[in-house]
C-alpha cells in the first residue's frame, strides 16, 4: 500500500511540474450529503456554450489514507484551450447528474485546484400531487465527431418500439420504407451494437426492438473492416446509426408478442426474439398482417395522401439470423433466412391528357391481384489478420414464384368518346437468383515512404425467369364503328449470366497525406430472352393450349441473345488534410478527390423477330469523371463544405437501335430507332454545407445543377381515327435541372423542451420530350418549364409525458409549355395540423391524437381539388409493470383519406388515384419479456 502511495505522489508531482508550461485542473468527486468519495463516478468535460463533449471520460483515482481507506476520489485533466468556459459533468448510477462551471483564462499558470468538489446527490423520487421529481437528462450531445442520442431522455409510452424513438429524435427523419436521414444526410445502415442486422433490413429492428432496451443511439462515420485490417484509409467510411442496448439487455434474450384485430377486417400478429451470448447473436421475426401500414399517430413524420399505401397488402413472413463475431472482430460469420408470402390487391384510376392537337384524353380504371412467395438464403464469412490480409465471401440464393390477374377499362376522348377498351389478364411464373462474391486482400511490403496494397475480387451472378401470360382485349371504336375481340398468350423465358473479376492496386503515403489507386475490372455478361406470342380464341395460358404453332404470331415473337464484354478502368487520387490534434485527434479528411473511370463496351446482339433476323454489334467508350472538394469551417469536422463537379455517360439498350416493330398490344405500337445514340450524358455541380457544432442549432444548405447534353425520350403520336398510340425513342438535348434548399433545426427553452425544424427547397426543371404531333411526320422537340417551391416544418413542445407538435407543409408547382395550345398549369398541395400525446403520471395511460387538413388546388380534375380533414387517435394502457400493453387505434375517423399522384411533362399531364387503406379501428395487445443469464454462467 505504501508503494502505491509513493507512485501516486510521484505521478502527481510530475504532473504539477509540467503545469508550469500549461495549466492542469485538479478536482474531486464525492457524495453531496455524506461527503464520502465516489471513485466509481464518471467525469466528463463539456463546452459550456453548447454542451459539446470535449473529454468523454477522465480517469478518477483513489487517494488512500494512512489506514488504507479511501480518503478522496481525484481527477486531473489538461484543458485544450487557453481561454474557455467548461462544464464539468459527473454521473454515477443511483445518483443525479452533477454539473460545475469552470472558467479558464490564458493568464492562469500552473495547477488549478477546484474550490468545491463535484457533489452527486442520490436519486430520490417523491410524489408531489401528480408530479414526480427526477433528474433531467440531455437528449443529444457530441462525443468527438459522434452524435449521441440518450434514449433515456425521451419519454415514450410503454409498448413503444425503436421506430417511435427515432421519429422523436431532433434532426432525424424516416420514411415509410425505414430509410433514415440525420440532418439531411441519408444513413447508410442501421446497426445493432456496431454490427449489421438482418443484412441491412432496418424495418425488422425498427418495428420489433422495444425502445426501453436502448441506452444510446450513436450517429457517426464508421471505419470499414478493410481499413482496420490494412491499417490505412483505403475505403470511405460509412455513415451509420448504431443502436446500443442497456447492459442488462446485452445478454440473454428479448422477446415480443403482438396480436391485433380491427374493423374493415384488419388484423395483425407478430413475434420477435433476440438472443445474445458473448460472441453470437440470434434473431427470429415472424409477421402476419393485412394492414400494410406505417403511419404513427402523433409521430414526427409528415405523412401525406401521396405517401399512403396504394394497395391492400396481406403479408406472411418469417426471418431468421445467426450472427457470430469473435471478440477481436477478426472472424465474422452470418447466416440469414427469409421467407415472405404476400397477396396484393390494387385499384387505380388515371386521367392522362396529351399536349397534342385535339388534346386527347384517356381515362382508365384498373383492378389487379398479385400473389408472391419469396425464399431467400444468405451466408457471409469474413476473416481478418490485422496488418496482413482480409478474406470475405458472400453467397445469396433467392427463389420467387408469382401469379396474378388484372382487369382494366379505358376510354379515349377527343371532344367526345371515341374508343372504349376492356382488358383482362392472367400471369404465372417463377424466378431464381444466385450471387457469389469472394474478396481477397493481402497487404504488400511497404516502400520507403509509401504503403502499398493489392486485392482481388470475384463477382458471379445468375438469374432465371420463366413466365406465362394470357390477355383478352375487347375494343369498341365509336369513330369508325367496330367491335373487336382478341386474345394473346405469351411464353417468356429469360436467363442472365454475369462474371466479373477485379484487380485493385493502391498506395498510401505514410504521413497520411496522399492516397491513389488504379483498378481494372473486365466483365462478361449474357442475356438470353425468348418471348413467343400466340393468338388463341380463349383466355388460357400457353401451357394449357394445343397446336401452338398454328396460332403463333411470328411478327411479335422473338429470340434475343445479347453478349456484353466490358472493361472498367478507374483511376482515383485524393489529397488529405489533417485537422488539428487538439480538437479532433489528427484524423485525416479528404481535401481534394479526383476520379476518372473509362468503360469500354463491346456488345453483340443476335435478334430474330418475324422476318427480321439480324446480328448487331456496337463498340462504346463511356466516361465518368468527377472532382470533389471538402472544406471545414475553422477546421471543425462538424461544419463541412462539400463541392462536387462531374460528367457521366451511361449506355442505352442496344435493342433500341434495332429497327423492329412491336404491335402485340392492341392500340399500342412500339418502334426501334437505328439512328439513336448509344449513351446518355449528364454534367453536374453540387454544393452542400452542414453545421452540427451545437446541440441547440443545426443547419444544412445545399444546391445543385445538372445539364443533359444527350438524353433519350419516347416520342408519341396519336391517331384519333384508329385510337392507336405509336412510341419511338428519340434523342433530345438541352434539358436541365436546378435545385437549392435549406434545413434548420433549433432547440431552445428550459431543458431544451422546444424544437423547431424547417425544410425549404425549390427547383426548376427544363424538360424536353421529342413529340410527333398529329398530322405531322417529323418529330418536334417540346419543352415544359416547371418551377416547384416547397416549405415544411414543425414546432414541438415536450416536457415529461406531454408532447405537442404543430406541423405545416406547402408545395406549389407552376408549369409553362413552349408548344402551341399549352395551358399554364398551377397546382398547390398544402397541409397543416396539430398532434399531441400525453401520459398520465400514475396510471401511465397514454392518449395520442392527430388532426390534419390536406388541401389541393389547381388540378385538371375538379374532383381532386378538395379539402380533406384527417383525424386519428389512440389510447394505450400498460399492465404488469409495462410488460403487457393494450392499445386502441382509430385511423381516418372522418373517412377523408385518399391517395393521389400528379405529374406534368412535355407530353402531357397525368393524375392518378390509388385506393388507400380504408379507415378502421384496431385493438392491439403486446407482451414484452426478457431473461438474463444467471450470474457466474
How would you describe each model-predicted region?
Residues 28-39, 137:
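Structural motif
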Residues 51-53, 75-76, 83-101:
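A short, solvent-exposed loop/turn motif at the edges and junctions
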Residues 95-114:
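Structured interaction patches on ligand/partner-binding surfaces of diverse proteins
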Residues 195-223, 278, 282:
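Short acidic/polar hinge/loop motifs at secondary-structure boundaries
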Residues 50-74:
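Short, acidic Ser/Thr/Gly-rich low-complexity loop/linker segments typical of extracellular
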Residues 30, 44-46, 89-93, 111-155, ...:
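Short, acidic, small-residue-rich periplasmic hinge/interaction motif at the N-terminus
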Residues 200-203, 223-265, 280-937:
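Primarily recognizes Gram-negative and organellar outer-membrane beta-barrels
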Residues 163-198, 216, 226-235:
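Extracytoplasmic beta-strand/coil segments of soluble accessory domains associated
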